[in-house]
Amino acid sequence: MSATMSAMSNNGAFEDLESLREPQRGFHHLEVPATSPSPWPESLRPLECPITGAGRVTTLAEFLRVTSATALVVVVDGVLVHEWYGSGVSREDRLLGNSATKSALALVTGLAVDRGLIPDLDVPVGELVPALRVGGYERVTVRQVLTMTSGVGWVEDYHDPHSPASQLIARWRQGLGGVRTLLPGIPDGEEPGTRYAYCSPDSMVLDWARESATGTTLTEAVHELWSLVGAEHPAVVGLDAPVDRGGVALAAGAFAATARDWARLGRLQVDGTWDGVPVVSPTWVEASSRPEQPFLRPGRLPSTLTTHAGFGYHWWPLDDDGDRVMADGMRGQFVYVDRPRRTVVVKTSAWPYGDAWWDRQCRDLCYLALPAIAEAAAAG
């Protein structure tokens, strides 16, 4: 992958944009066709709202600039009301969600649960995937990987090139395959279900268990979802190797879609329906939007992650009731859902890779700004 633009993000330029826009040019992938496209109804209007954060009040335009936004899409009650794209990005571009992919995985997992294909979230993942009957996942349940409370001995550290996390990502980026073969070798750590730790292998184990239970790959599951919500454009699912060499989806972070179509996933998380037709059950939506344990509530997660959100079923709730949730991906990819206001805000970005200070500052600002944008848009 080559970058066509580079500069420090605080002047509005994008670092390594090409790794986030149409990212399939840099990795093995499968395309998810848009077989039943249904464009959003539109009532586009200017959007102005003050953004308060970092001790000052700024404008929406300045917020987009200083956080290196690449796209902003706002949908209120199923109507597209605001749309903006940064330089070099268009409404047709598929934008890599990074770990926002995990929230898409939660939705297709919900479909499997609703259909009884995963009848019990408290079943050990090893009962669905025999290869996981050893190692750190031996006693871990589907519920525990959904809530990232597996307790396995994993550190999400991509700065150390020799860390297991870096090795896993390298296998994907280099197309070496075999990502799933690494999962049984992850050791145990703490008692499952007793603490939260951000763990991308939990997402990969979840998808492996879902695939085993349903007989469908992530690409096939997303294809069904894409048809149900009338996606306008094909999406992309990244693989760890070519299909003919047994490549599987990197379910923790390699899904790309247009900003408009990312908004469809947010709209589905409002109440589980599409145009009044049930897609995912309200029971699943409610459960996935809320923290199940006190230590999963907003403000209770490790402060190195966020002080603004908790954790549900691969969604980040901003309150104990799950009224406001976020899909959150590395380098500034967000799908914010205000469920009572039936409003979705998609913001994609091109933050510098590996800059922990920049990431934390911008992430904190986005967790303050996106709710304000949703409230202003819903108010008309």
Task: Please annotate each region the language model reported.
Residues 1, 5-14, 327-380:
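Structured C-terminal helix/loop/strand segments within mature extracytoplasmic catalytic/sensor domains
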Residues 1-90, 113-119, 147, 181-185, ...:
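N-terminal leader/targeting segments and the immediately adjacent pre-domain N-terminus
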Residues 40-43, 47-63, 79, 89-92, ...:
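Active-site-proximal loop and beta-strand segments within enzyme catalytic domains
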Residues 78, 96-121, 145, 206-210, ...:
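Active-site SXXK
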Residues 96, 115-153, 185, 212-252, ...:
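Active-site helix/loop module of the DD-peptidase/beta-lactamase fold
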Residues 202-209, 251-275, 333-349:
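Active-site-proximal alpha-helical segments within enzyme catalytic domains
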Residues 232-240, 289-344:
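Active-site Gly/Thr loop motif
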